[in-house]
């Protein structure tokens, strides 16, 4: 049961990251605003 929960959380995290990268492809940190970082063209939310 615990393994299934961890797997589901990882799947959700990957889906969110893929969704963000498709919607908000970026070139530098200035395009992402104060709550995100641009890493290799992908928007990653930070806190």
Curated annotation (Swiss-Prot):
Propeptide stretches in the record: 22-27
The record's keywords, sorted A to Z, are: Amidation, Disulfide bond, Secreted, Signal
- The reply to whether Protease figures as a keyword in the UniProt entry is no
Q: Which GO terms describe its cellular component?
A: extracellular region
Q: Where in the cell is it found?
A: Secreted
Task: Report if keyword Repressor is assigned.
Answer: no
Which stretch is the leader sequence? 1-21
Q: Which residues carry this modification: Isoleucine amide?
A: 46
Chief localization = secreted
State the protein's purpose. Leech salivary gland peptide with unknown function.
Similarity field: Belongs to the annelide toxin family.
Q: What else is known?
A: Does not show effect on voltage-gated calcium channels, potassium channels, and tetrodotoxin-sensitive sodium channels. Does not show activity on Nav1.7/SCN9A, and shows very weak activity on cation channel TRPA1.
What is the official name of this protein in its record? Answer: Peptide HSTX-IX
């Amino acid at each position: 049961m615990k393994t299934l929960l961890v797997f589901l959380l990882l799947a959700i995290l990957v889906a969110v990251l893929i969704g963000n990268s498709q919607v908000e492809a970026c070139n530098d940190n200035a395009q992402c605003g104060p709550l995100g970082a641009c890493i290799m063209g992908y928007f990653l939310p930070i806190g």
